[in-house]
Amino acid sequence: VEVQCNRGVNGIEGSVSAAVGYAAVSDRLNFLLVGDLSFFYDMNALWNGHVRSNLRIVVLNNGGGAIFHALPGLDMAGDTRRFVTASHGASAAGWAESQGFTYLRVTDTVSLLAALDDLLDEAATAPVLLEVFTDAETDAEEQRNYYHAIKEEWKNFLR
């Protein structure tokens, strides 16, 4: 497995563009795992007409920049949280399909398992975009639990 990364300020800009570029110079499948806000920020990269069929994009769509839900202080009054997280109800379906992608929608484990064969098909003649819809609050809670578990493991390891 070869891993390439493009990380800008807060990781939002250029991820899709970089993935299109990596796929353009590779004969292997190239996967981009990206949040919805990052995807929508850079989705014009798919418009350039040079997207190869070896590109696989997995968009985690939780209705905005849910990573920001984990930041302290966002329980502020008013619209602060909405503006910081850029909450939305959008989907990547129309854009992906208009650019010739095979679009796959995932809302649960059953639809995820059904989509995996298409996502991993090396003989596909079109790039694939798999959009996974999740709940922002659940995502933030799972992230907190994950980092807490890692912290506890390190504490136990260092004893």
PLM regions with names:
Residues 1-159:
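Thiamine diphosphate
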